[in-house]
Structures are given as C-alpha cells and as structure tokens.
C-alpha cells in the first residue's frame, strides 16, 4: 500500500529553493525498518526524483510512504509501481510513467520474469529494471532506463542485458495496465 502526502511546505532546514523535496519511507510488514528497507527507500527516491517534475513545486515537500503488507517477490518493482500510481492519483506532475519488472537469473542461466519469493531465494541473481515510459510525438513509446538494481551474481554481461531487455518489454505491458486502470478510474468519476 502506498500513500502520498503533499505537496506541502518543506521544513526550512530541508527546503530547496529551486525544487521539491522528495521523502520516501518504507515500512516492513512487522517490526522496525532495517537496512533492506533503507536501501529500498534510497532506490525509490532516486527513481522518483527522475520522474517527478520537481521545478513545479519549489520549497515544497512530498512524502511517499510504502507500507509492505506482504512480500511474495519482486517487492522493489511493486513498490515503485505503487509509488508511481499514487503520485498520479495525487496529481503530481510527472515526466512519464515508471514501468519495469524484476527478473531472476536461475542457476541454469535462464531468465524468469516476475519471480515469487521462493524463486528469488533460489536464483543466482535478481535484477530489477525500471524505465521512464512516455509517448513520443508519433504515438510510439519511449522507454528510458532509470534504475537497474542487481542482487546476487550476474556472471555474464549477456545475462544482465537479457534481464534489462525482458524488463523493457514488460514495461510496455505495465504501461498498458496503467492506461487501462486510469481509464477505468476516469470513467467512474465521469459517471458520478
């Protein structure tokens, strides 16, 4: 579950004259946040900083809170997609939509998209690739890589390239889902 608070006035000690301050908090299912949550916060904040048009809200702050309810794998990609949709729902101006996928490199070298938690544990490496997806003037999709995070040992450059390529194609599917979800939400608002 992801919530967006703001934009609101930033504290004087943290405000930036030329742009928005973006805070990300990741809360685990139970207990206190640990190093994994702190790393996720940094990765999400870095990716969202590329996505949000920060110059539109100088001296303001936005807080994105990710509450993990369950972890069945691909948590970083799921949190990023949730954060992007929450920002859209809050009306925050974005450069594009964040889309991508987690891929697991299995021991035999095969690449598995959207692995579950057990598949991630048994994988040689887990790679999360996320793209800023936006429409070009001709109607085609532009996918710009903004985050590639690997855990484990990716033994060959070809394996990493295969993970990024598969995630690039999955980004098109995620973008289509975004469009469908937003059209459904818009139609529900129009009917009211």
List the predicted regions and their residue ranges.
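Polyanion-binding surfaces on beta-sheet-dominated domains and ring/shell assemblies
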Residues: 1-192
């Amino acid at each position: 579950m992801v919530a967006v608070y703001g934009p609101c006035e930033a504290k004087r000690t943290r405000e930036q004259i030329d742009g928005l301050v973006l805070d990300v908090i990741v809360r685990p299912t139970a207990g206190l946040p640990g190093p994994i949550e702190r790393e996720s916060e940094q990765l999400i904040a870095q990716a969202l900083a590329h996505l949000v048009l920060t110059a539109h809200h100088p001296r303001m702050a936005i807080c994105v809170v990710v509450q993990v309810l369950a972890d069945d794998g691909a948590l970083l990609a799921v949190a990023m997609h949730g954060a992007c949709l929450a920002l859209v729902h809050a009306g925050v101006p974005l450069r594009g939509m964040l889309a991508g996928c987690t891929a697991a490199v299995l021991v035999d070298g095969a690449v598995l998209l959207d692995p579950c938690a057990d598949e991630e544990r048994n994988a040689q490496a887990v790679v999360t690739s996320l793209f800023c997806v936006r429409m070009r003037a001709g109607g085609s999709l532009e996918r710009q890589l903004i985050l590639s995070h690997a855990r484990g040992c990716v033994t060959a450059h070809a394996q990493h390239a295969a993970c990024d390529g598969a995630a690039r194609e999955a980004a098109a599917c995620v973008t289509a889902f975004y469009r469908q979800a937003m059209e459904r939400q818009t139609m529900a608002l129009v009917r009211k």
